[in-house]
A protein has these predicted regions:
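A generic structural signal for short, solvent-exposed coil/turn residues
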Residues: 78, 119, 172, 203-205
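Compact, glycine/acidic-enriched structural inserts
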Residues: 26-29, 132-200
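Long amphipathic N-terminal alpha/beta scaffold segment
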Residues: 56-84
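Broad hydrophobic/π-residue packing in well-ordered secondary structure
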Residues: 13-20, 24, 124-126, 130-135, ...
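Long, solvent-exposed, polar/charged low-complexity segments
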Residues: 1-57, 64-65, 182-258
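Residue-identity detector for glutamine
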Residues: 2-5, 19, 58, 76, ...
Length: 258
């Protein structure tokens, strides 16, 4: 039996992404519940691995919103939901450090006590589904990103060693159906890829783009069966985490073990 059933994917069929009525929200809540079940399967392995990879500090935000969000002043900050995700990223301490040392990111003075250190403005590993596909996704940056992309690209520009390290970290992903994606354009990670070709593609990234490394699964894929999905996604975490650790910019001097 699949963890994510056809009705989970159907929760994002048009015109539902533009709707927020009780029936549509109830469908998204079922998606949220399934993603939290996936978290229960994955989190013990993440904890045992000792990775610097964390939940959002508020359980409410372990999974993306299942309903539209409107600020007190009437500004809509979530008014379209065509997919949902479970995500892991930087620690609360690291995000608090950013606030104390360099200031927060205040997007339209959002009335959210977590927005000053906006977990979702930073590099994350997430498990995502829409009406067509399930993704394991190392998300370097969204259309709004705080430091990670710019600092990562600076390192690639300035340091031959950084280029070599990225290429080294990519090797375990080759021929496993992963691709690097920038603004919807894909670069397949497969045998024959050279460091020059990889870096040339990665450096095309720009502010305002979604970018990262993805592996996709068809909704009826056997590896998404309840008996296999945990093993498969833990394997993906093991492959993606060293690259996440390399890409994610941190404001302290801790060494980054890979």
């Amino acid at each position: 039996m699949q963890l994510f059933q056809p009705y989970h994917y159907a929760a994002f069929d048009p015109p539902k992404p533009t709707q927020d009525d009780p029936v549509t929200v109830s469908e998204r809540i079922r998606v949220r519940d399934a993603l939290l079940r996936l978290d229960e399967m994955l989190w013990p392995a993440i904890s045992r691995a000792g990775w610097d990879l964390h939940h959002h500090r508020q359980r409410t935000h372990y999974v993306s919103s299942d309903h539209f969000i409107t600020l007190d002043d009437g500004t809509q900050v979530v008014n379209f939901i065509d997919g949902m995700w479970l995500h892991y990223g930087k620690s609360p301490n690291q995000l608090d450090y950013i606030k104390l040392q360099v200031g927060g990111y205040d997007y339209k003075r959002r009335d959210d006590d977590e927005y000053y250190n906006a977990f979702y403005l930073h590099t994350r590993i997430q498990f995502y589904l829409n009406n067509q596909v399930f993704r394991a996704w190392l998300l370097l940056a969204t259309d709004k990103n705080y430091y990670d992309r710019s600092e990562f690209l600076k390192r690639l520009d300035k340091s031959p060693a950084a280029k070599e390290e990225l290429f080294r970290l990519i090797q375990p992903l080759l021929d496993r159906d992963f691709f690097y994606e920038i603004d919807g354009e894909r670069f397949n990670l497969q045998s024959g890829v050279t460091q020059e070709l990889l870096v040339r593609f990665v450096r095309r990234d720009r502010p305002g783009f979604y970018s990262g490394i993805v592996k996709e699964y068809a909704p009826n894929g056997p590896l998404l069966d309840e008996s296999r999905i945990a093993e498969e996604m833990i394997k993906n975490l093991g492959l993606l985490y060293p690259i996440y650790n390399f890409m994610a910019y941190r404001f302290d001097a801790r060494p980054r073990a890979t």
